[in-house]
Amino acid sequence: MISEIAKLAALVLTNTVKVDDFLQSSKLPPPTFHEDGPIDLGLSPEVEAARVAAIESSLRLHDLLXGPVELIRPTVNAXSLEAIYKYDVASKVPIHGEIPIIELAXQCKMNEPDLRRILRFAIIHHRVFQEPRKGIITHSAASRRLVEDSAARDGLGLQFDDAWQSFARGFSLAHNTDKSVFEYMEAHPEKAKRFAGAMSSFSSYRGHGPEYLARGFPWASLGTKTVVDVGGSEGKYSIALAKSFPQLKFIVQDLPAVVRAVNAKRPIPLELEDRVTFMEHDMFTEQPVSADVYMFRFVFHDWPDKYVVNILRRLIPALKPGARIIISDSILPEPNTLSELYERKIRALDMVMLSFFNSRERERDDWERVCQEVDPRFKFVDAWVPEGAALGIIEAVWQPEPTMEXPKAIESDESSSTGVXDSAKGIKGMESNGRNGXISVTCVDDVDVN
């Protein structure tokens, strides 16, 4: 009888051959650790599925062969990346060149034996840098990205300086503050700038592009309608949708600082200026626009349920019968229903949301429950994840009963605009959505995480 490890090895081989055959037939470069290696392989959906299957099989094979003792050892792998980030090692290594470790240590103001150990650990665990000859360092594809992609550097910094501390204690305790994440960033411009860069990096990951939102919902079936993009930042997704669906008009709403920055940059193509407009609006205040569709992309995962409910209740005075609410956000899978690779990533993101914002990613049932809590007239329609997309789509429709009275939005310091700082996106042009309410992340014991 064939063992599981042999089956996994066969799956790794079979799926890797599919990827390799596609790359060769398409005359695309294969993946390599060399500094000129491709960042994205350009695979078709079918071959992308084979790539993911090969990775998943190899991960399971690795864990089985390592055994249970290895699986419960604390991880120290990221310590080398933290040092590489803090000492900006990558920028000191020439592109298409080489540098002796002893010279690199002098430029980084580091002890040479320590740097040598750190680099060799990073090379073997993360494929960051290469050592073609003893004591000589060159770039790998991964380390070169740290030089040429500032958002990738910001992503590391956010993880090491903010996320790690927050994982251990919660954001507010870790940073000795009673402010929420966004308030804290507002008071620390250098962290806000890095946060913005990190969000830009994360939004470039596989499955996050506007094309997934465009393909994942039947926008063409709406007809000639107006879509309000609440918390839409620079309007990247509204602009993309407007290009694909000429019958739709978009109003992108965000805080005044964001709208002023957008107007100064004027990112809207000339041919779309009559169909994509910007409007100052705080989503914790009453919605002033009566429209056909309200879109929230990647807004709600920053917020605990009670704030999401409050934001949606602010729409009610403007809603007309049949108005749709389209939410593009994470949908946690049921255990063992999706690929292990995807589930690992989304559950890691869920832990980040817990530690940073005292919020969470939500399952389908959570989204349905939130809609019901907002108002019985919010009818949950469906929730799904488009093929290849990192974010799901949640659809609700407003179906009022003539005699029903709308529930009032929660009045609290957190939802008041007085004394509350701008949204994450309002800080140095952050792409992260959400408004800065006074959420004190000081204790995670009482958080309901399903």
UniProtKB/Swiss-Prot annotation:
- Which top-level enzyme class is recorded in the Swiss-Prot or TrEMBL entry? transferase
Report the protein's function: Non-reducing polyketide synthase; part of the gene cluster that mediates the biosynthesis of orcinol depsidone grayanic acid (GRA), the only major secondary metabolite known in C.grayi. The first step consists in the ring and depside synthesis by PKS16 leading to 4-O-demethylsphaerophorin, involving different orcinol-like rings, one with acetyl CoA and the other with octanoyl CoA as the starter. Further depsidone formation by the GRA cluster-specific cytochrome P450 leads to 4-O-demethylgrayanic acid.
Which residue positions are annotated as catalytic?
Answer: 301
Q: Which Gene3D superfamilies match?
A: Vaccinia Virus protein VP39, Winged helix-like DNA-binding domain superfamily/Winged helix DNA-binding domain
Species source reads Cladonia grayi
Which EC number(s) are documented for this chain? 2.1.1.-
What family is it from? Belongs to the class I-like SAM-binding methyltransferase superfamily. Cation-independent O-methyltransferase family. COMT subfamily.
Keyword terms, alphabetized: Methyltransferase, S-adenosyl-L-methionine, Transferase
Q: In which pathway does it act?
A: Secondary metabolite biosynthesis
GO: which molecular function terms?
Answer: O-methyltransferase activity
Q: Which residues bind S-adenosyl-L-methionine?
A: 254
- The reply to whether Hydrolase figures as a keyword in the UniProt entry is no
Keyword S-adenosyl-L-methionine set for record: yes
Q: What is this protein called?
A: Grayanic acid biosynthesis cluster O-methyltransferase
Gene Ontology biological-process annotations: methylation; secondary metabolite biosynthetic process
